[in-house]
Design a protein with these regions (language model features):
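Small/polar beta-strand repeat architecture
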Residues: 154-174
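Strand-loop-strand motifs at the edges of beta-sheets in extracellular beta-sandwich domains
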Residues: 141-156
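Residue-level recognition of well-ordered beta-strand positions that form the cores
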Residues: 65-69, 165, 192-194, 229-231
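Solvent-exposed edge beta-strands and adjacent loop segments
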Residues: 1-79, 129-132, 137-142, 201-202, ...
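Secondary-structure transition/turn motif
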Residues: 69-70, 111-114, 127, 152-159
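Extracellular Ig-like/FN3 beta-sandwich strand-entry sites
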Residues: 61, 157-161, 186
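Extended beta-strand solenoid/passenger and fiber regions
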Residues: 73-142, 167-189, 193-202
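Protruding loop/beta-arch "assembly-hinge" segments enriched in small, turn-prone residues
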Residues: 221-249
Length: 249
C-alpha cells in the first residue's frame, strides 16, 4: 500500500545570510520545531443583510517559530545578531578552594591569575556565607582583589578556608560581540527546510527572512532550547519562496 505524503518530526533547517557575499550555510542544530504561519487580513463587504456579499484578502504576514537544541553562535549570528566573532573567550572558575595564610600578608593568588579577568565573589567554605568586597584594608569577613588575581583578606580571617569565584580568559572558542547598532540594522537570510518520510521529501525555501526575537530559557531538569521568531518577506524578484511536494496529491 502506498502511503500519502506525510511528515514526522521537526526536519532540518539551514540558514544562509543574503545581505553579505559568500555566506556560509549554517544548520541551526538539532531542530526541535519549525512552525511557519501565513496570516492574511480579510476585508468583508456588507450590505443591509447579516452576511457579507464579498471579501478580499489584503496584506499577508508570514512568520515562523524555530526551536533548536544546540547553542550555535554561528546560527545565532546568522539569524539575529549579524555581528562578528573574535577568537577566545571567558572561562568560569567556580568555587576554587583556597586557604587564607596563617600569617601576613593574608593574600591568595588564584590558579589562573596570569589570565585573570573578573572577580565573581568569595564565600567561606564551611558556612557558604559570602565575604564583602572592599577597595582596600579589609576587616573580618571582607576581601579586596587586584587586577591580577591576588585576593587580600583580614588578619581576623587567617587560616580560613575560602571558595573563590572568578573568570579568566582563554584562547579557545569564539566570542560574539553584540554592538549597539543603528536602527534598521539586522541580518537577512534564506531559510531552507527539509523533511522526509517513506522516501518522500517535503522541501521549503524562504528567500528573505529576518528574526524579530531570539530567546533561550534555562530551566531546572530541562535542556536549553533556543527559539527564533522569524519573519519572511519577498525578495527583489517579488517572490517569497517555494514549497516542493514530491507527488501530485
Amino acid at each position: 500500500m502506498t502511503t500519502p505524503l506525510d511528515a514526522f518530526g521537526p526536519g532540518v533547517i539551514i540558514v544562509t545570510r543574503t545581505d553579505i557575499a559568500n555566506s556560509t550555510p549554517v544548520n541551526i542544530g538539532y531542530a526541535q520545531e519549525f512552525s511557519p504561519e501565513f496570516s492574511g487580513n480579510i476585508k468583508e463587504l456588507f450590505g443591509q443583510n447579516q452576511f457579507p456579499i464579498d471579501a478580499a484578502r489584503g496584506t499577508v504576514k508570514v512568520t515562523g517559530k524555530i526551536k533548536a537544541a544546540v547553542l550555535s553562535g554561528l546560527a545565532w549570528n546568522t539569524a539575529f545578531f549579524g555581528s562578528s566573532f573574535v577568537t577566545g573567550g571567558i572561562k568560569w572558575n567556580p568555587l576554587e578552594a583556597a586557604s587564607v595564610p596563617a600569617v601576613s600578608t593574608y593574600t591568595v593568588t588564584v590558579i589562573n591569575a596570569a589570565t585573570f579577568d573578573a572577580d565573581l565573589g568569595v564565600v567561606y567554605a564551611l558556612t557558604n556565607l559570602p565575604f564583602v568586597k572592599v577597595a582596600s584594608a579589609p576587616a573580618a569577613g571582607q576581601y579586596s582583589v587586584s587586577g591580577v588575581g591576588v585576593y587580600t583578606f583580614a588578619a581576623a580571617d587567617a587560616s580560613a578556608a575560602v571558595l573563590i569565584n572568578y573568570t579568566s580568559t582563554v584562547t579557545t572558542g569564539q566570542t560574539l560581540t553584540i554592538a549597539n547598532s543603528l536602527l534598521g540594522s539586522s541580518p537577512s537570510f534564506q531559510l531552507d527546510y527539509y523533511t522526509s518520510r517513506s522516501n518522500k521529501a517535503f522541501v521549503a525555501r524562504y528567500y528573505q527572512c529576518q528574526s524579530a526575537k531570539i530567546s533561550f530559557a534555562a530551566k531546572l531538569e530541562d535542556f536549553i532550547m533556543p527559539e527564533f521568531e522569524v519573519h519572511m518577506f519577498a525578495n527583489s524578484a517579488g517572490n517569497l519562496g517555494k514549497l516542493y511536494f514530491p507527488e501530485v496529491s
